């Protein structure tokens, strides 16, 4: 059959609408935190779609300090909430994963309280999940509270060596998404 210009225009518009639908973009960032007196309190690496860069940033961090009780978790959370370039898109999924093995210092007074920080995160549309490494019960209680107040999930990460890396068919594709 013969296509009229209106038909061609309608079909082109339909194709352009389909092609123009944005696919989800994954952006990740890091905020490393330690404690006062360590070589740094926080190091923030802003959100990026380049997952290779996130991995490189992660490799620049080394464990240090620690083992001496609470850390400046509140400053790390504050930086994650306020210093990352979060999307302003209403439909964007915005999540923080707090990962650590120590409870927060709540006696410094240089940040809002844990409750205030998590309320701010929720108001900004952020979900705060908490992954506790190890089995310290005080840290576990704090991380459970973070997940509850941050409307996220608590994720225990055992440190007994029983964790295994499992390759998936999606690993190569995930790496490509960051390029």
Predicted regions and their residues:
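Divalent cation-coordinating acidic motifs and surrounding scaffolds
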Residues: 1-176
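Conserved catalytic region of serine esterases and O-acyltransferases that act on ester linkages
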Residues: 179
């Amino acid at each position: 059959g013969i296509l009229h210009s209106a038909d061609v225009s309608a079909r082109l518009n339909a194709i352009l609408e389909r092609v123009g639908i944005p696919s989800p973009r994954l952006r990740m960032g890091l905020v490393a935190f330690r404690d006062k007196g360590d070589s740094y309190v926080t190091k923030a690496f802003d959100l990026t779609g380049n997952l290779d860069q996130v991995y490189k940033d992660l490799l620049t961090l080394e464990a240090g300090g620690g083992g001496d009780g609470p850390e400046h978790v509140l400053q790390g959370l504050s930086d994650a909430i306020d210093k990352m370039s979060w999307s302003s898109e209403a439909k964007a999924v915005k999540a923080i994963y707090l990962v650590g093995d120590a409870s927060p210092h709540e006696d410094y007074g240089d940040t809002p309280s844990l409750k205030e920080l998590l309320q701010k995160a929720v108001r900004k549309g952020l979900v705060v999940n908490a992954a506790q490494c190890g089995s310290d019960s005080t840290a576990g209680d704090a991380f459970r509270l973070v997940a509850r107040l941050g409307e996220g999930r608590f994720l225990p990460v055992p440190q007994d060596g029983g964790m295994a890396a499992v390759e998936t068919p999606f690993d190569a594709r995930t790496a490509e998404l960051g390029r």
